[in-house]
Amino acid sequence: KEVSIRGQGSLAYPGLRTQGNLETLSGPNDATRGLTSLADTFEHVIEELLDEQQVIQPSKEHKDADLYSTRVMLSSQVPLEPPLLFLLEEYKNYLDAANMSMRVRRHSDPARRGELSVCDSTSEWVTAAEKKTAVDMSGATVTVLEKVPVPKGQLKQYFYETKCSSKGYAKEGCRGIDKRYWNSQCRTTQSF
């Protein structure tokens, strides 16, 4: 019977506070404040998250809990989308562009300014069948398990890997380098 919705209200009941349990909620007469904006709702949720000063300490049995990586996923099938971190970054860029005037947005577009990546790259999910070793967050090379045992069977381990594209400028050197005077090449490096 506990209500666990965050924020000041919902679209079904504008302005209704959704804290407490179902018996303590007031009737619809108290919900006359009007519909709160989506930005206000997000602002309140973010304030709640920032106000919480609790530091989560891993228990003794889960001491490796801080070794989580956003580029690794356990799943029975290939993930359909990139990791959440990359999606959030794209969304942030979208919001930044939405706050600009059309003239500023047009002139800040990387394609319009002639900005290109030095090397072409591709990003994809790979399995341990394709990747036998990996570099952990400490910089040590570790052996990768192809399948991870779980109570209801086994899950495959997927890694989101970004590497130099085999086609394009990789053979001719990097973009923006004067080929008459300098030699350059695009190489995949480890980053974490």
Curated annotation (Swiss-Prot):
Keyword Disulfide bond carried by entry: yes
Record-annotated disulphide pairs: 119-186
One Pfam family of this chain: NGF
Residues with glycosylation annotation: 99
One GO CC annotation: dendrite
Propeptide segments, given as residue ranges: 1-106
Record-stated family: Belongs to the NGF-beta family.
Protein task: Promotes the survival of neuronal populations that are all located either in the central nervous system or directly connected to it.
Listed name of the protein: Neurotrophic factor BDNF precursor form
Species this protein is from: Corallus caninus
Source lineage: Eukaryota, Metazoa, Chordata, Craniata, Vertebrata
Gene from which the chain derives: BDNF
